[in-house]
Amino acid sequence: MNRWLKNMLHNEAASGVLIFLAAVAAMLIENSSLEPYYNSFLNIPVAVQFSELKIAKPLLLWINDGLMAVFFLLVGLELKREFLEGQLAQPANVVLPVVGAVGGIVGPALIYVMFNYTNPVALQGWAVPTATDIAFAMGVLALLGKRVPAAIKLFLLTLAIIDDLVAIVIIAIFYTSDLSVGSLTVAGGAIALLFLLNRIGVKGIAPYVLVGMVLWVAVLKSGVHATLAGVVLAMAIPIKGETPEHGSPLHALEHDLHHVVGLVILPLFAFANAGVSLAGLGLNVLLEPVAMGIGLGLLLGKQIGVMGAVWLANLLGVAKKPESLSWTQLYGVALLCGIGFTMSLFISSLAFEHSGAQVVAGAADAGHARLGILSGSLVSGVLGYLVLRFSLARKG
């Protein structure tokens, strides 16, 4: 296994552990006497002003709109590298994970719609169970130790990367508010400048970051979700340095961001968004359509969608299952894809907490959504771990 993959897996495993601890801490605090301090912390007003431009948001939204843009910058860098020189650069390696990812998106979405098709507010959350939390999934794999074959890790990583790409498209198309033509014009100019910098051979990161900040503000003001600015910025970062000795600007930035995102931003995001009140929690809450749709979408929709699509593609000869992977191991991976957690929480915040005139209904659905995300992700992770542990023990 190459050095990049080893570093990636090590970082994702550590990140998964921290995300889990942050989520547990948030839930414990939310259900203790410290709850007022927790919510006051998340609602601290933070304002940034430059001349006539002012951005004022509570801390929670700075985390969700600002820090998560850095996360999506990293996702974009990984996607670009993978498509240009990684596993996704070889078409034969892409087909099966793409098929699995598509199945893993359609399956959960259909299950969610089955439970919520009569409620237009709840229906906004159809994309919540389609996400996969790569850091958490790799963290579960890390618990199995060195006996996990590289093929399992590569398949899960590739599928999750493609899943991230689809999530970006979903956010861009379905979770945008009223658009501002003026801000979109500024954003378009910033994008053009980014790719002009790439075209004329600018290799330093600083000019891209400065223009990227302008792009983020413009996208934030435009009505399109600001995190997408991170993806666009990533596409403009050059992958080749001035000389082979100087190294790749893209690789350098990706390396620098991995630890910041995995060990700081994602755990902070989990801490800020995973606080679910368990007061009055009973079977009736778990059976709410939004909670059921998301929980079962992650638990059943993901495994049925991924496994069904992969099995059908293999049967029809569209793509072949790697000989080094058993069907039981692929099933374990499909279960791990049901760990939506941070990505699902993020999409949930877009679907329900920015619901405009339907704030009350959206807020209620947001609480049920978080419960569904946590329960579905937890059960998927435990079952995925047990299935893979069993299959690897039999093989050993």
Swiss-Prot record:
This is Na(+)/H(+) antiporter NhaA 1. Na(+)/H(+) antiporter that extrudes sodium in exchange for external protons. InterPro entries: Na/H_antiporter_dom_sf (IPR023171), NhaA (IPR004670). It catalyses: Na(+)(in) + 2 H(+)(out) = Na(+)(out) + 2 H(+)(in). GO terms for molecular function: sodium:proton antiporter activity. The keyword Zinc does not apply. It comes from Magnetococcus marinus (strain ATCC BAA-1437 / JCM 17883 / MC-1). Keywords: Antiport, Cell inner membrane, Cell membrane, Ion transport, Membrane, Sodium, Sodium transport, Transmembrane, Transmembrane helix, Transport. It is a multi-pass membrane protein. PANTHER family: NA(+)_H(+) ANTIPORTER NHAA, SODIUM ION/PROTON ANTIPORTER NHAA-RELATED. GO terms for cellular component: plasma membrane.
